[in-house]
């Protein structure tokens, strides 16, 4: 959570303090009446909770955790981070699942229970998770079981950076400089290094 809030605080004109975002995550955790996965889902994705942005998915704000917390809308990975970090504060074991094209959260104690934060916390079994993948990539898309393996915090940060880069390239290319400067400080695997080299050519 701190890395993603630092990302948000690094943009021009933003509040350099991460305190508000951390305070909001703390508040969400304190306000959860039942500290279980089911309790978290009801608490975070209920009537007045966070939800997927279905009107403007590629809005750059959907990749900025402070904006997601303030607006209560986001994309799958940032909504998943809200769930993961609130759960961490409550001792609820959860892991992030970086499936290509979509992001899920898995119960840390049940390898067949997934949560789709973008779909208001819908629960999925393994078969339904595969079906969700094919609903995005096509019914004949090859599915590798490795797609349902947990990912670490650095992988989540890199993926959020990739999403934000794509959104800014489409919407606000003039704001890419600050993001590129930040990305140069974040170690990335070879595929992302190639993408970063292409981004450097746009400067």
Stretch-by-stretch model annotation:
Residues 1-203:
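A structural boundary/capping signal
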């Amino acid at each position: 959570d701190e890395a993603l809030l630092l990302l948000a605080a690094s943009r021009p004109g933003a509040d350099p303090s991460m305190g508000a975002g951390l305070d909001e995550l703390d508040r969400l955790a304190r306000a959860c009446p039942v500290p279980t996965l089911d309790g978290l889902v009801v608490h975070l994705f209920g009537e007045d909770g966070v939800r997927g942005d279905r009107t403007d998915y590629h809005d750059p704000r959907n990749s900025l955790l402070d904006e997601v917390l303030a607006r209560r809308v986001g994309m799958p990975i940032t909504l998943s981070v809200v769930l993961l970090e609130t759960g961490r504060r409550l001792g609820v074991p959860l892991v992030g699942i970086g499936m290509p094209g979509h992001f899920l959260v898995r119960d840390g104690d049940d390898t067949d229970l997934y949560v789709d934060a973008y779909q208001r916390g819908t629960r999925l079994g393994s078969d339904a998770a595969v079906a969700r993948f094919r609903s995005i990539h096509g019914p004949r898309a090859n599915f590798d079981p490795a797609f349902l393996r947990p990912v670490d915090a650095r992988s989540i940060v890199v993926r959020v950076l990739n999403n934000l880069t794509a959104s800014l390239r489409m919407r606000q290319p003039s704001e890419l400089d600050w993001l590129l400067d930040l990305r140069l400080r974040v170690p990335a695997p070879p595929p992302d290094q190639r993408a970063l080299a292409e981004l450097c050519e746009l400067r």
